[in-house]
Amino acid sequence: MSGFLDAEAASFAIGGATLLDRIDLRIDRGELIAIVGPNGAGKSTLLRLLSGDLRPTRGAVSLQQRAIHSYAPRELASRRAMLSQHVNVSFPFTVEEVVWMGAGDRGRGTSQSLVDAALHEVGLDAFRDRQLPTLSGGEQQRAHFARVLVQLRCGEVEHGPGLLLLDEPTSSLDLRHQIDLAGTARRCARNGTTVIAILHDINLAARFADRIVVLHQGRLAADGAPSQVIENSLIRRVFDIALVVRTAEDGVPFLLPQMIDAARPQSEG
């Protein structure tokens, strides 16, 4: 049985180098998937395959049981929204104007409430009239996240919950805003949006994701519930570091480098 988004033996090669090798994934509607792995593992390439930006050199990617490359660009844009890791805007747009870009050519009366809601959701209500280049990197990242939220929600009016793809969305954010953004992504998933996010922080992934997909050297190394992946000894080999598993008070497992764990004060018995 197919999922909302499927990769079937999907591979991608360029210049004789295989960046992804026979990736099989079934992602159901409303799942929040975190993709983790060391640098160069193929995470961004996989996200671009799943978004339809890249075509697999072998295998297939399908969205709602239809080859993702069979969608016309405008049709695909109304069904999925993607936040890239680095977005450069050199023109002096205001924050609100950037967020409005997510609405495309839809009328202002139709989408103003979506823009207002997105600005509020990312905590930029008071920044709407600021020029984007005057903001910090983290604030700019939040503005672009609001933009893709508007794009996603405009598409929902036509097609129902869509696909949200996030490439290192927390890379420029402080801890508070990392948690806020991850919480927003989780709420999107609970409302039916299918969310796929590349994260460097596997503990953040364990806290918010339904599943963690681990890539290593272009191959699928693990795919499962956060607790299964965190507690799998394979994760130490993938990241090539000594890690220990600990459990938070609410039962969620997390990883610590062994040298940090050894330095923690031991509780008195």
Curated annotation (Swiss-Prot):
InterPro entries: AAA+_ATPase, ABC_transporter-like_ATP-bd, P-loop_NTPase. GO terms for molecular function: ATP binding; ATP hydrolysis activity. It is found in: Cell inner membrane. It is a peripheral membrane protein. GO terms for cellular component: plasma membrane. NCBIfam families: PRK13548.1. ATP binds at G37, P38, N39, G40, A41, G42, K43, S44. Pfam families: ABC_tran. Keywords: ATP-binding, Cell inner membrane, Cell membrane, Membrane, Nucleotide-binding, Translocase, Transport. The lineage of its organism: Bacteria, Pseudomonadati, Pseudomonadota, Alphaproteobacteria, Hyphomicrobiales. Its main location: membrane. Signal peptide: none annotated. Part of the ABC transporter complex HmuTUV involved in hemin import. Responsible for energy coupling to the transport system. Its EC number is 7.6.2.-. Belongs to the ABC transporter superfamily. Heme (hemin) importer (TC 3.A.1.14.5) family. This is Hemin import ATP-binding protein HmuV. Residues 5-242 form the ABC transporter domain. The complex is composed of two ATP-binding proteins (HmuV), two transmembrane proteins (HmuU) and a solute-binding protein (HmuT).
